[in-house]
Amino acid sequence: MAPISIADIVAALPAEDTWGPATASDNMLQGVPYAPFSKGDKLGRMADWTAESKDPNRAGRQAYNRNYRDQQVYGAGSSSLFAVQVAEDESSFSVVDNTRSSAKRTFGRGGGTVFRGRAQRGGAQRGGRAGFQRVGAGRGQGGDRYYDNRSGGRGNRGRRFGWKDYDKPQRTREPSVNVRPDWNMLEEVDFSRLSKLNLEAPEGEDVDSYGFLYHYDRSYDKAPVKNAERRLQSLDRAAYNVTTTQDPVIQELAEKNEATIFATSDILSMLMCAPRSVYSWDIVIVHQGNKIYFDKREGASLDLVTVNENAADAPLELADSANKQDAINTPSALAMEATFINHNFALQTVVESEDSKVSLAHPNPFYNAAEETEPLASKAYKYRRFDLSLERDDEPVNMIVRTEVDAIMKNPVNGEDQQLLVKALNEFDSKAQGSGGALDWRSKLWSQRGAVVATEMKNNSVKLARWTTQAILAKADGMKLGFVSRANPRSAAGHVVLGVVGYKPRDLAAQMNLNLGNGWGIVRTIVDRIRALDADEDEDKVTKYVLIKDPNRPVLRLYSVPATTFEEEEEVAAEEQEAAEEEAEE
């Protein structure tokens, strides 16, 4: 073989200055669409013309397209139409169910519990007022319309929550009272600002006490015997819920200039726990001279005990087209049921014995033995004074609060009397919408009591916070929380007592992270604002304000209203109650 010379190799090189394979002008793959693929996947088809396309212009798709991409992307290992289909693959095999599915039964027929209201006769002469407000008495003025009202065909059925929540109907609530055209909004404060307020919590001192107390029945503290549940009884006892301005004792203390601010514990506790509230409520503030009264309307929402107000999926009001069989689980019906339970539970858990009755300094100020036919309920009214003064104040700022205690109990160690506040939590159905993921009390109350109480603290944060605040304001030694459930989840007529748990108010406040200093800071801020608004007014002029919690936002609004607001409505309500009593007697 002839040797190859280097000169021949150099002569055979191309004349161009490029390096590599020869380039051609024509490209065989020009115009062929490119489909993304993974080099690790086998190709079973050349192209996919049947894939479902995403419409980028559809409303609400922006968030989806931002977080989710097509399956056919580079590196995607999920199966697609491009993948090779194995002949014996059983993943595509499915069975068609042609059986007729039966509709799920919901709750049976049931109306709300009939809660009988009662009023104090001769209340206008003695400054009294209706005892237990008749449920629905204020509906014409929006008395109980602060609950949820969600439209749509879903009724009150539950649903799963996910990324498509933007496409669901929004939950809306009605205000507790309708804002009238002649009302002037003065202030709007959100809860984030209220939560930053703080005032050193005063201890308080007793000014006077009225009423009497029966001893608490300790047998309710024991675990119930199996198949021997205690029924909740409906007892007829005279109980009163008199507002601040119509309390004859507060009127007497105001004339003696014992304080400059007056309120009741149920009204004050709502204001102090305002950042925890969800439903709408309202408080009437009356400023006369140098006196400020925190008052409430006739039939106000403050008189009702809410149920699962703070739950993530709170109970819903039924729409017009919804299933009427679930009417007993609506917020308004549950509130009426819970108010009925709390009233009767406090009466049932005491031993009504005249020998062991503990009478306070004065008799019940709202009871008239000549006109009343029902016996008095065990109740003590303690009027306590709190010092809200600051260093910048020229004169002391004192507040008198009417607090309440339900029963008394002997201390097992030293034998001293301990005053108790008795309240009840109620279970309607652990499987129904609005239950808030609560456990079944019948099977879990004594075995998993901590989990049951923790769930109630989450779902009823504002209710438990108000009760704890009322107990601390009254300087009660203990609290008794009863657990009451329906005898039948489909009926709100019968209830059973499953157990009672005792707490010290301060310990329960620590468990709930309840800061009373924040509550006193809210009260002092409202008082300072009212005084600043009326700084230039005459001392004899009466000014009235309404503080309203927004039904759908964590906001408080302060309105200036005419001095005669709500007075005509209260007179009409009083006349209706008197007429109803006369008809009942006939």
From Swiss-Prot:
Database matches in InterPro entries: eIF3d (IPR007783)
Identify the domain of life.
Eukaryota
Q: Extract one GO molecular function annotation from the record.
A: translation initiation factor activity
A GO cellular-component term linked to this record: eukaryotic 48S preinitiation complex
Domain observations: The RNA gate region regulates mRNA cap recognition to prevent promiscuous mRNA-binding before assembly of eif3d into the full eukaryotic translation initiation factor 3 (eIF-3) complex.
Positions of region (Disordered): 102-176, 567-586
What is the organism of origin for this protein? Aspergillus niger (strain ATCC MYA-4892 / CBS 513.88 / FGSC A1513)
Localisation = Cytoplasm
| Similarity field | Belongs to the eIF-3 subunit D family.
- Would the keyword Transmembrane be found if you checked this record's keyword annotation? no
State the organism's lineage. Eukaryota, Fungi, Dikarya, Ascomycota, Pezizomycotina
Name the residue ranges with Basic and acidic residues bias.
Answer: 162-174
From the UniProt entry, list the residue stretches annotated as the region RNA gate: 301-315
Assembly description: Component of the eukaryotic translation initiation factor 3 (eIF-3) complex.
Q: What is this protein called?
A: Eukaryotic translation initiation factor 3 subunit D
GO terms, biological process: cap-dependent translational initiation; formation of cytoplasmic translation initiation complex
A Pfam family found in this protein is eIF-3_zeta
Annotated keywords = Cytoplasm, Initiation factor, Protein biosynthesis, RNA-binding
Stated role = mRNA cap-binding component of the eukaryotic translation initiation factor 3 (eIF-3) complex, which is involved in protein synthesis of a specialized repertoire of mRNAs and, together with other initiation factors, stimulates binding of mRNA and methionyl-tRNAi to the 40S ribosome. The eIF-3 complex specifically targets and initiates translation of a subset of mRNAs involved in cell proliferation. In the eIF-3 complex, eif3d specifically recognizes and binds the 7-methylguanosine cap of a subset of mRNAs.
